[in-house]
Amino acid sequence: MADKEATVFILDLGSSMGDCNSGRSESDLDWGMRYVWDKITDIVAASRKTLCVGVVALRTDGTNNKLQDDEGYEHISVLQDLGPMTMSSLRSLQDSIKPSDTSAGDAISAIVVAVDLIDTFTKKLKWIRKIVLVTDGQGAMDADDVDDISRKMNDSNIELVVLYDWS
């Protein structure tokens, strides 16, 4: 039997992600999204209910997440709750991915939102757990609780992949 996988993509949609850097003619967001779309379309093509995807947007104009009433979780929006990805949800997601008009929003807090999505969905069952953060690193980050967050990720066996361009 194939392993169950839960992957949450955190997409930095801050205004700076609309810039073109490193000599590219495409925006930083479009460059990073090539990797994300490749991974998500592979998951959709596999058509397995045990390959689950969630999408969290960072540095968004609005706020929509379970922790939004707590300080520090503003400008973070869950675009898709963790679960199987379908073609229709993929199309809907594609329409919502564009740079925002803000630079506010904390990547560390977005990771906390992603960890919460994964823990809530997978419970203590056997899953491969992964968070993929796509960012240009231009947003402010509050690293006060990073040791506790790192410990929580290790305890939950969550792998973190960071795709960035610091140009």
Where do the model's predicted regions map?
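Intrinsically disordered, low-complexity, Ser/Thr/Glu/Asp/Lys/Arg-enriched terminal regions and linkers
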Residues: 1-167
